[in-house]
Curated annotation (Swiss-Prot):
It holds the Pfam family PTE. It comes from Bos taurus. A divalent metal cation 1 binds at H26, H28, E169, D298. GO terms for molecular function: N-acetyltaurine hydrolase activity; zinc ion binding. This is N-acetyltaurine hydrolase. One of its GO terms (cellular component) is cytosol. The lineage of its organism: Eukaryota, Metazoa, Chordata, Craniata, Vertebrata. A divalent metal cation 2 binds at E169, H201, H230. It is an enzyme of class 3 (hydrolase). Binds 2 divalent metal cations per subunit. PANTHER family: PHOSPHOTRIESTERASE-RELATED (PTHR10819), PHOSPHOTRIESTERASE-RELATED PROTEIN (PTHR10819:SF3).
Length: 349
């Protein structure tokens, strides 16, 4: 049995699972997203280079990945500290920071934010999508990648003694690449060794989550300790959603606050709004999956911070929870989704 068994590992050390409270399971507090810059059309180049100001906020909201400054969340540490203090004041207790290698992970800043705010912060080990993999990462064997993941949890990440408490978000593209497949296999092997929680970023295709689960299963992963992120932009069909739910992984609706007319990364998808997300969560609760649901905002760009007129990290607690109660989701179910399910997932076996 691991020395981590029965505990949750935050950037400040091990804590008892019962101390977490309401938990957002998929957020970012410091990262860069240059890897996913989406060049604007020539007619929009000028506005894409302007500072973030009131008159261009609507354009940035519709084209968040075409504005380079908007992709530098790591420049907003003080603003994010204030947002975390507000999150705590609104009843929040913990947050899983999903920034991995490839997105400028900075565990030192995460530790500082945890110390300054009193919010439990759990850091993520591992690698983002193939486009961010270095030649060194691509050259590693599954066994070597496993060692990297285990080391980031047992010893520390980014050359520090600050330890990660989950593996992920592990980035997957569609179709899955050879390098991503190796990382998934290594993730399953590390999970077997450590009994740790895992969280996956699936490719933008409804078949991607199914393929990923199969790879993890074949490599010996524990699906019951695994989160499939971004369900709200990936599995839109009700029948397919209920079919996927039978695998037993956690189903994460983590784009609350994102209401896009045009989804730049996949124009074929009509991104659901928060009302539709609430309906999907209600469906899953009614179908008996309330112990498999997680929620978050996946804030990863500046425009989603309250400093820039965005919804911020307190949106779910302030706006979504009351609306869910109006739509017939009980307080008991919400406590499961926001407190009990994250606690169970984040606790090492």
């Amino acid at each position: 049995m691991s020395s981590l068994s029965g505990k949750v590992q935050t950037v400040l050390g091990l804590v008892e699972p019962g101390t977490l409270g309401r938990t957002l399971t998929h957020e970012h507090l410091t990262m860069t997203f240059d890897c996913c810059y989406y060049p604007p059309p020539p007619s929009h180049e000028a506005i894409s280079k302007e500072p973030i100001i009131m008159k261009n906020l609507f354009w940035i909201q519709k084209n968040p990945y075409s504005h380079k400054e908007n992709l530098q969340l790591n420049q907003e540490t003080e603003a994010i500290k204030e947002e975390l203090l507000d999150f705590k004041a609104k009843g929040g207790g913990a947050l899983v920071e999903n920034t991995t290698t490839g997105l400028s992970r900075d565990v030192r800043t995460l530790k500082w934010l945890a110390e300054e705010t009193g919010v439990h912060i759990i850091a993520g080990a591992g690698f983002y999508v193939d486009a961010t993999h270095s030649s060194e990462t691509r050259a590693k064997s599954v066994e070597q990648l496993t060692d990297v993941l285990v080391n980031e949890i047992l010893c520390g990440a980014d050359g520090t003694s600050i330890k990660c408490g989950v593996i992920g978000e592990i980035g997957c593209s569609w179709p899955l690449t050879d390098s991503e497949r190796k990382v998934l296999q290594a993730t399953a092997h590390a999970q077997t060794q450590l009994g740790c929680p895992v969280i996956i970023h699936p490719g933008r295709n409804q078949s991607a989550p199914f393929q990923i689960i199969r790879v993890l299963q074949e490599a010996g992963g524990d699906i019951s300790k695994t989160v499939m992120s971004h369900i709200d932009r990936t599995i839109l069909d009700k029948k397919e959603l209920l079919e996927f739910a039978q695998f037993g992984c956690y189903l994460e609706y983590d784009l609350f606050g994102t209401e896009l007319f045009h989804y730049q990364f996949n124009p074929d998808i009509d991104m659901p709004n928060d009302n539709k997300r609430i309906k999907r969560v209600r469906l899953l609760v009614d179908e008996g999956y309330e112990d498999r649901i997680l929620m978050a905002h996946d804030i990863h760009t500046k425009n989603r911070l309250t400093k820039y007129g965005g919804h911020g990290y307190s949106h779910i607690l302030t706006n979504i929870v009351p609306k869910m109660l109006l739509r017939g989701i009980t307080e008991g179910a919400l406590d499961k989704i926001l407190i009990e399910n994250p606690k169970q997932w984040l606790t090492f076996k």
